[in-house]
C-alpha cells in the first residue's frame, strides 16, 4: 500500500477530481441560511370570544383547551394569552427535532376533545390550529402614494393580490397581513332608532341571518321522472347579499295594512369596513400595511428573499396607480453580509496558511503540494454536507475556516517527512515518498481517527446546543476524513512528481529564519531535557495549571450566544393603561420621527396597537421595527446595534405620555422576543390576580437591586381601568327579560357581534353588528340600548344593570396550565445572560412565597436546559480520544501522555477569552472541542516518534527528547498555520463579528498554549509512562518486529 498511489498518480488524481466535482455541484444546490433549524417547533391555537373580558376568555376558552392539550407528545411547555379584546392565543412549544406537521395534527386532535366545552360563540367562529413559522424572513410594506386609497383598500388589495401569491413561492412558509384588516360588512346600529321602532339588536341579527343566507333551489326536470322532458335545468336564486346597498335593504319589519317596510338602513349605517380596528401602522410616517413573511424550514433564505423581491416587482406592474410597496425589514441582509464576511475570512485564512507553509518549507514546489491538497478537502466537504442534509450557514462555515488549518496538517506531515528523508538519506523523490508513507501512514490515520473520535460523538447530543455542535463538528469531521484520504493518495503522488532531488542554498531571509528557528529549537530542546530530568518540578507546574484552569472556568461568565449587530432593532412604546389607539399613534409617530433623526437609522416601521413584549394587541402599546444602515456606513461604536438602544431610549426620554424601550434582537430569531431573558412567575395556589400581582412585584423589585440585572419588568398589568357591569338577574326575571338577550344587546352595542358571512371577490368575509361610536363612549349610553321583555315592552339596559369603575388586567397569561405573569429583563453592562439567569434564580428563591415559582421560556429555557452541555462534550471527547489511542497503542497507559496536552489548550483558551472580556458561550465551547483534537494531534506526533525511538533501543528519556526535537519544526509549522488561519476570525469586524470573535479568540489562545507550553511537558509525561520497556508478545520473532500500531510505525 505504501507505493500503490506513488506508482499510480492518475488514479490518485481521479479520486481528488471526483471529490472536487461533487463538492462544486453541491455548493450550488445547498440551502443558505444564518443558522440551521435551531428554534423549537411551535403550534398555535387561536380562538375569539367577541366582547368577552380577558378573565372570561382565560377561564372559558384557554383553560379547557390547556387541560386537553397538556402532555401532548414531545411538548416542552405551553403558554396562553387571553386579551380584553376577546382573543386567545395558545402556543405549544415542542422539543427540537419534532416534526411540526405531526405536532400540529396531535394538537388539533386534543383541541377537538375540548371544542364541546367552549362557549357557543367561540365554536361558531371556530378554533384554528396552525404550526408557527418562527423564522421571520422580512416584511413587505404596501402603501398609497395618493389620498385616493385608504388603509382598508390597500390592505385588502394586498390580501387578494399579493399575500396568496407570495405564499406559493418556494421557500416561503407563511405570509401574514398584520392587523386583521380583512373586509367586513359593518352594520353600525343606532340604538335610538332601534328604540323608536321597538327593535333590539337581536331582531337585527335575526333579520340578517334570515335574508343573508345561501339557499339551494333544486332542479327542474330532474330524475326520477317517467315524463321527463329533453332538458334538465338548475334553479338559482339570490343567496348571500353582494354589497352594502343590498344589506341596507334588508327588511326588518313589513306591514300588510299600510304597505310600510322598515329596512336596515332606517336604523343603521352599513359600509364595507374591516374586521378589526385595533391596529394602525406606518412606514417612515406614511400609512402602510405590514406583510410579514416567514421562512419554510430548511429553505434557502437568500434565494427565497430574491424570489420575493422579483415577484413583488412583477406584481407592481399590475398595481393600481397610486399604490406602491417597499421591503423595509429584510433579515437576509445580515445573513448575506455575515456569510460574505466569513468567506472573506476563509480566503484570508488560506492565504495566511500558504504563507506559513512557504516560510517553513522555503520551496515553492513543496508549498504547491498543500496548496493543491487543501482545497480538495474543503470543496469535497460540501458534498458530505449535502448528503447529511446540512445547509451553508455560519456554523458550517466556521467549521470550514477552522478546517483549513487542520486539513493542511495531513499534507504537511507527509510532505515534511518526504523532504526530511530526501535530505538526510539522499533518496530520490519517488523512493523517499514510498519510505515516508511507511512511516507516516500510521500517524495520519491516527490523527484522522482521533479528530473524528472527538467530533462525531458530539454530533449525537440533543437540544439546541447539540444541533449547533453537530453542524460544526460533523463539517470538520468530513473535511478531516477527506484530508486523510487525500494525504494518503494524492499527496505522496504529488511529492514524487513535483519535488526535485537536491536543495539549493536558501535565500538570505530564509537563512536568517532558519538560524533563528534553530536557536529556538535548541532552547526548546534544553527546556524539554530540563523537565525530563526534573519531573517533580514539571508535575508541580502542571498541578498549578490545572488549578488555574479551574479558577478561570469559574471566573469566565457563561452565556448561550453572543449578541450581534444584526442591522436592525426592536422598539416598544408603552402608554398608560387603557390609553386609546389614537394616543398611541400620536406617541409612536413622535418617537419614530425622533429615531429617524439618528444617522445610523435607515427605516422605521411603526405598528400602533401591537405589543411586541406581550405578543398581544393592546391599544396602549406600539411596536417599531428599526432598520439600520449598512455596516460599512456604521463604523463607530455608538452606531453599533448593541449600543444604539440606550441612545434611542435617551433621545425619547422626554416623551411624557409614554415610555419607550429599545433592544437588540436575540441572536437566533424566533427563540425569544428580545435579546434578554424571559420567564413566567407561576401561581400554583390558585390565589387569583391580586396574589399573582404581589408575587410579581416582589420579584421585580428585588431584581432591580441586583447589579447583574437591568430593565427587569413585567408585561402583567392588573391596573387597567375597566367597568364592572352587574346584572340584577332577579329584576330581569321579574320583568320577563331573558338573561341572554341582555348580554347579546351589550355585545352588539359595545362590542362586536358576528352574525354570518358574505361573499366578495371569491372570498368569505364576516358580517358584524356594532353601535355607532357616539352610542358606546361611556356607561351613560346604556340608557339608549333596549331589550324586549316577554310582555313586548322595551326595557332600557340601565334599568337592569349597575356600573362600577374598577381596575383589572386586560391580558391574562397562563404557563403550563397555571396563571402566570411574564417577566423580561436584560443583563447589566459587563454581565452575561448566564449571570442574569443565576441572579434571577437567586432572587426567586429568596422572595417568592410558597406556591409560586419561576419557569423559563425562550432562549433562557434553552440556556438553562443545556447548562453543562459544553463540559459533557469536552469530557466525552477526551474519553473517545483516550479509547482510540488505547486501541491504537494496545496499551492503557500510553494514551495518557497524549491526553495531558489537553489541559494546556483549555487553559490557553480560557485565559485568552478572559483577557478579552468574552464569555463561555456555545461558540467558545465548540472551539474547546476542536482544541481537544488539535492538542491531541500535536501530542500524537511527539509520542508516535518517541515510541519508534524507544523501540530502536533508546531509553525513555532519550526517546522523548529525540522525538521532541525531531517533531518540533512540523508541530510549530502546522500549529502556526492553523493559528494564523484563525486570526481573521478573532480580529474581524462587521456583521456577525461577535460570534467570530468568540470562537477565534478561544481557539487561538488554546493553540498557542498547546504549541508553546504543552510541548515542553508531553515528552516528560511520555518518559514517566514509558520507562518500563514494552512487553514482547510470545509469538513475536526477531525478524518480524512490530510497532504498537502495526506496520509502518502506526500508532
Swiss-Prot record:
InterPro entries: AcrB_DN_DC_subdom, Acrflvin-R, MdtF-like. It is a multi-pass membrane protein. Coiled coil: none annotated. Induction: Repressed by BepR. One of its GO terms (molecular function) is xenobiotic transmembrane transporter activity. One of its GO terms (biological process) is response to antibiotic. The chain crosses the membrane at residues 10-30, 341-361, 366-386, 387-407, 444-464, 478-498, 537-557, 867-887, 892-912, 928-948, 971-991, 1002-1022. Residues 1032-1051 are annotated as: Disordered. It is found in: Cell inner membrane. One of its GO terms (cellular component) is plasma membrane. Its main location: membrane. Involved in resistance to several unrelated toxic compounds, such as dyes, detergents and antibiotics. Belongs to the resistance-nodulation-cell division (RND) (TC 2.A.6) family. This is Efflux pump membrane transporter BepE. The lineage of its organism: Bacteria, Pseudomonadati, Pseudomonadota, Alphaproteobacteria, Hyphomicrobiales.
